[in-house]
Amino acid sequence: MKAFHLLAALAGAAVAQQAQLCDQYATYTGGVYTINNNLWGKDAGSGSQCTTVNSASSAGTSWSTKWNWSGGENSVKSYANSGLTFNKKLVSQISQIPTTARWSYDNTGIRADVAYDLFTAADINHVTWSGDYELMIWLARYGGVQPIGSQIATATVDGQTWELWYGANGSQKTYSFVAPTPITSFQGDVNDFFKYLTQNHGFPASSQYLITLQFGTEPFTGGPATLSVSNWSASVQ
């Protein structure tokens, strides 16, 4: 009987460490990280998506998201992600943004990307789901999907060659660094991307606050497919 109670307690503890997020904007917070199902574009097509949290603490996050979307071939349906809570500061005052991302997709016959998404704004109190500038780092893309705008350069950052794309979404200026082949294990300094933009494309680092830092996947169509993130962590220093 004691063994049964011990097993039951362990099972309960395991369940308590996880969360299943299926509502449109369901979130789970652990430590300095928040995981968001974030089905912001679901009305552009039809389908479903749920995100499972394996762990979230000050040490990092582990989670997965399973989706199946159809319709609206060129429209993003969601951005399930893990985001970092940090003290906002001017980009010019940031010394480094170390990060690690290890992930895998169980189905690559899809239209989707796997990407970092960061927003900056001149107003430190700007809403966190948009900005004056957006920086995306695409670690992978499948099915021929493309960032907003067009390619303007080939850049070398953090020892990796990237396609650099630029486009505008209303007044928001978006720079996207796109890996030519999937990077399923990434460890680097996101601040190096800001430094590149400041030095080569006039990014106003001294007047823009970093307000959002996230990592996740943008599905367009396809599935069922599951993105599994075995580890993601980041800090703003």
From Swiss-Prot:
The modification Pyrrolidone carboxylic acid is found at residue 17. It comes from the Eukaryota. Disulfide bonds: none annotated. Induction: By cellulosic materials and hemicelluloses. InterPro entries: ConA-like_dom_sf, GH11/12, GH12. GO terms for biological process: cellulose catabolic process. Residues 1-16 form the signal peptide. Its EC number is 3.2.1.4. It is found in: Secreted. It catalyses: Endohydrolysis of (1->4)-beta-D-glucosidic linkages in cellulose, lichenin and cereal beta-D-glucans. It holds the Pfam family Glyco_hydro_12. One of its GO terms (cellular component) is extracellular region. Gene3D superfamilies: 2.60.120.180. GO terms for molecular function: cellulase activity. Keywords: Carbohydrate metabolism, Cellulose degradation, Glycosidase, Hydrolase, Polysaccharide degradation, Pyrrolidone carboxylic acid, Secreted, Signal. Belongs to the glycosyl hydrolase 12 (cellulase H) family. Will also hydrolyze 1,4-linkages in beta-D-glucans also containing 1,3-linkages. This is Endoglucanase-1. It comes from Aspergillus aculeatus. The lineage of its organism: Eukaryota, Fungi, Dikarya, Ascomycota, Pezizomycotina.
